[in-house]
């Protein structure tokens, strides 16, 4: 289905209502919230999923739809602004991890990442990574000791060459991967 197809928009609406029905909203409130999310979603199901998650987490007020970000990339921007208000902390602690993630051809193993990241910053250990992963929230998840973006679009947004304060250079990520490979005797061509 095309994103603008009325069946797609109806699917998004039904999803929002079903997901938020667990909360204490009246049918009228659910309808209004769903209509607002569908309108701002630009037909992107992932947008609706993320907004519902943010509403459930108390990060977005469902009664202020004009405050909802427009489009998926704006969702990511707003999310990062809330999670990383200090750009210094983001650049020092989070960006080095994200550089590796966006440059990798395959999901990265934690036991490979931590030694390299601790080489860059002596504070990096499993507890430090757990804190960073908590801040990243649902955008990146740990699956069996592997870090996985929840959707390709998050890496696309991070690496877009625009004015985002959270921009991650894929080129610098590749340089980090090469340094990592040299330090730990990995074959970069396999990463």
Language-model features and meaning:
Residues 1-95, 110-112, 123-126, 143, ...:
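Non-catalytic, charged helical/coil tracts that couple and regulate nucleotide-powered enzyme cores
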Residues 5-9, 105, 154-156:
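Conserved nucleotide-binding/hydrolysis micro-motifs of P-loop NTPases
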Residues 106-116:
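Short acidic, hydrophobic short linear motifs in intrinsically disordered regions
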Residues 117-183:
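C-terminal leucine-rich, beta-strand-based interaction scaffolds used for sensing/assembly
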């Amino acid at each position: 289905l095309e994103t603008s197809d009325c069946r797609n928009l109806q699917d998004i609406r039904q999803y929002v209502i079903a997901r938020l029905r667990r909360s204490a909203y009246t049918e009228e409130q659910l309808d209004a919230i769903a209509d607002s999310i569908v309108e701002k979603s630009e037909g992107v199901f992932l947008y609706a999923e993320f907004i519902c998650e943010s509403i459930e987490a108390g990060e977005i007020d469902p009664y202020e739809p004009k405050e909802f970000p427009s489009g998926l990339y704006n969702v990511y921007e707003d999310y990062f602004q809330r999670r990383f208000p200090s750009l210094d902390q983001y650049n020092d602690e989070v960006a080095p991890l994200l550089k590796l993630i966006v440059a990798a051809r395959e999901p990265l193993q934690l036991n490979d990442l931590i030694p390299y990241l601790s080489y860059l910053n002596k504070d990096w250990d499993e507890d430090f990574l757990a804190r960073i992963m908590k801040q990243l929230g649902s955008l990146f998840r740990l699956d069996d000791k592997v870090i996985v973006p929840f959707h390709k679009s998050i890496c696309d947004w991070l690496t877009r060459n625009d004015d985002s304060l959270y921009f991650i250079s894929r080129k610098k990520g590749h340089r980090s991967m090469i340094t990592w490979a040299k330090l730990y005797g990995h074959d970069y061509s396999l990463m």
